[in-house]
Amino acid sequence: MSKTQSIIRGTLILTLAGILTRLIGFYYRIFLSHTFGEEAVGLYQLIFPVYALFFSLTCAGIQTAISRLTARYTAVGKSLQAVRCLMTGLIVSCTLSILCMIFLQQTSPVIALHFLGDQRCAPLLYSMAYAFPFGAVHSSLCGYYLGQRRTNVPSFSQLLEQLARVSTVFLLCLFTLRQHFTPNIVFAVLGLAAG
């Protein structure tokens, strides 16, 4: 397969996975609003700037570095160096994510009250922190496979991640309703860690 065909194929795979993921996400948001109500979904949306900030601190640049270095080492036949790069990135990213998880769990009441302006966000922030280590591993592995031009792996994992998130929240809600309790928006936050 030529380089141009490989790029086109990779782009198509990523695009298709992105479209499917967005479609699932579209119906997921409808499910959330019907299940938890507008106010709870508003609280859920309120924590996402904090999620984006901490995720950027733990993963964003590391994924790009792993991808670039893997591509460079793979191009010259140094696959062992590419694996070492992945391992180093995983260690750094996981360490940062665990530190951020602990920090966020310890300071969630303060962040909820003083930065988000709503104390009800504290348990959501606390639960959301569990997603960081999983996100670090996922991000590093995706960077590695993208660097190897194996776009099918990150595409499939993106789709699988969304399905795991939706399934986890749906099953938690179903179980809670069968026990005659009201589902809590914390389930949606735990879905972040599951996906």
Language-model segments: residues:
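Small-residue-rich midsections of specific transmembrane alpha-helices
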Residues: 45-70, 74, 93, 130-134
